[in-house]
Regions:
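Conserved donor-binding/catalytic core segment of Leloir-type glycosyltransferases
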Residues: 4, 186, 227-281, 287-290, ...
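A conserved catalytic-core segment of Leloir-type glycosyltransferases
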Residues: 34-116
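Membrane-proximal helix-turn-helix segments that form the acceptor-binding/catalytic region
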Residues: 164-185
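Carbohydrate-associated surface elements
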Residues: 191, 213
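Nucleotide-activated donor-binding/catalytic signature segment of Leloir-type glycosyltransferases, i.e.
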Residues: 307, 315-339
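Aromatic "clamp/platform" in nucleotide-sugar-dependent glycosyltransferases that forms part
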Residues: 356
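Short hydrophobic beta-strand element within catalytic cores of glycosyltransferases
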Residues: 373-376
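Conserved acidic donor-binding segment of nucleotide-sugar-dependent glycosyltransferases
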Residues: 388-389, 393-400, 409-414
Length: 466
């Protein structure tokens, strides 16, 4: 049986990682995957990102150079985030004419990718691809996959759209209609299972909990210590820096010197954040909490902020916060391939995610799979992943002092850090390994293909996270 996995965005976030690992494991469960996805130069090249898979890239190179990237041929995707001067403006600012242009383009992309011959179309996010699939191949059943950013935009619209979101109402209506037309909706957390039916006005029976996971062959305990650890951070910070300044967005405009690597000597504990520079991630809060905690550390413990797609940020840039606080030992190595992430995690000791609206928390389970205890916010996805006090730390949202206290305990109590890391390793492997998760997604496809009622695919009892 054939499934077409469709992703409008070029690969830079969690949804692309999900598609890559899911596709790699679907063949073992009777489904042959094809991926159609946006593509951009460099790290966002879909052909390279989905290497080894049947991928049909939609090249956005020309669109990125156009006066209006969304009116190019082919057009670039819009965004669920409203970032000033970004080429992909927020969906809620996209007018009807541009919307129709996007739909028409994706009708063609889906046809060329073989959508009409697929048994299932797996649509990531709620985008004009959904409308295109309905128009181009209405008889092929659709499975939707919500990754969280679309829900955040819908929440903003419901609370009162920001200025300039002149088409917010139309987009909210479209997204609800697209969700309702899917046979099933995969969501990342029990919290989303509870919230999505009301938010999108869909039958609760079609909403299925499908957490993200990790590849156990890639993410495992292979700790880098001593010279090997320093060597990796030398490569990422000194020899091949990719950090960038808000006023100079070329990769490498933030770099470091050999003497800066003293922070990583003597197997000092390393605190690692991984992700984009978006406002909900609360990187400025993390840096300020670290500045508050650092004087109470019993040993040097550098904070590494890994990520930040070049030129993309919301609110304060991390470098601006570092300069404003004057804090030392905070490092910005920039954006690196997901293929490098396991090495980075194994050269660290704690993974930290201060995000206040994280629908899942992909990097948490990847870090846990490498034996790192996580520190995260007690809300949404992280609250279902982490057992506070056993395999990590959970802190209240937007609580700088609580975040600082968790950092201090993680740094100063090595025995407790290792105990929680051991537990994190075991719990991640028991719950979030991709081979097992892909089997569950394949069973959803099987049910949809067989025409089973929604209630037969609905999740069982969900954990109580209130």
């Amino acid at each position: 049986m054939k499934v077409l996995l469709a992703l409008m965005f070029f690969p830079r976030g969690g949804s692309a990682q999900v598609m890559r690992y899911l596709a790699k494991n679907l063949r073992d469960n009777g489904w042959e995957p094809t991926i159609v996805a946006g593509s951009a130069p460099g790290e966002a090249d879909a052909t390279k990102f989905f290497d080894g898979l049947d991928v049909r890239p939609i090249d956005y190179s020309d669109a990125l150079e156009a006066d209006d990237p969304l009116r190019a041929d082919p057009p670039m995707h819009p965004s669920f985030e409203d970032r000033e001067d970004a080429p992909d403006r927020v969906f809620a600012k996209v007018d009807d004419e541009t919307y129709e242009h996007l739909v028409a383009a994706w009708e063609e992309h889906l046809r060329e990718a073989g959508a009409a011959d697929a048994d299932i179309i797996h649509l990531n996010h709620l985008t004009p691809m959904n409308e295109a699939a309905e128009r181009a191949c209405p008889d092929v059943p659709r499975v939707g996959h919500l990754h969280g950013t679309e829900l955040l935009m819908l929440n903003e619209i419901a609370e009162g759209p920001p200025g300039g979101w002149d088409h917010a109402g139309e987009w909210a209506d479209r997204m609800r209609r697209w969700a309702q037309s899917c046979e099933r909706l995969l969501v990342l957390s029990p919290d989303a299972v509870r919230r999505v039916p009301d938010l999108l006005d869909v039958d609760p029976g079609k909403v299925v909990w499908a957490p993200n996971g990790f590849d156990p062959q890639i993410f495992d305990r292979r700790p880098k210590t001593g010279d090997e650890r320093v060597k990796l951070w030398r490569e990422w910070l000194v020899d091949e820096p990719r950090g960038w300044r808000p006023d100079d967005q070329d990769q490498g405009s933030v770099s470091y010197h050999e003497e800066d690597l003293a922070a990583f000597a003597d197997d000092n504990p390393v605190l690692l954040y991984v992700g984009r520079y978006t406002e909900v991630k609360r990187i400025p809060l993390l840096i300020r909490a670290y500045a508050r905690a650092r004087d109470r550390f019993e040993t040097r413990a550098p904070l590494v902020i890994l990520g930040g797609y070049p030129g993309e940020w919301e609110g304060e840039h991390p470098l601006e916060v570092i300069q404003a606080t004057g804090v030392e030992d905070v490092f910005l190595p920039g954006w690196r391939s997901h293929d490098d992430l396991a090495d980075g995690l194994n050269a660290a000791d704690v993974v930290v995610l201060p995000s206040v609206r994280e629908q899942f928390g992909q990097v948490l389970v990847e870090g846990m799979a490498c034996g790192l205890p996580p520190i995260a916010v007690d809300a949404h996805g992280p609250a279902t992943i982490i057992e506070d006090g056993e395999d990590g730390w959970l802190v209240p949202a937007d609580d700088e002092e609580a975040m600082a206290d968790a950092l201090i305990q993680a740094v100063n109590d090595a025995d407790e850090r290792r105990r929680r890391g051991d537990n994190a390793y075991e719990s991640s492997r028991a719950r979030y390994s991709w081979p097992a998760l892909a089997k569950e997604v394949a069973s959803v496809y099987d049910d949809v293909k067989a025409g089973k009622p929604e209630s037969e695919t609905a999740p069982g009892p969900l954990p109580d996270i209130t």
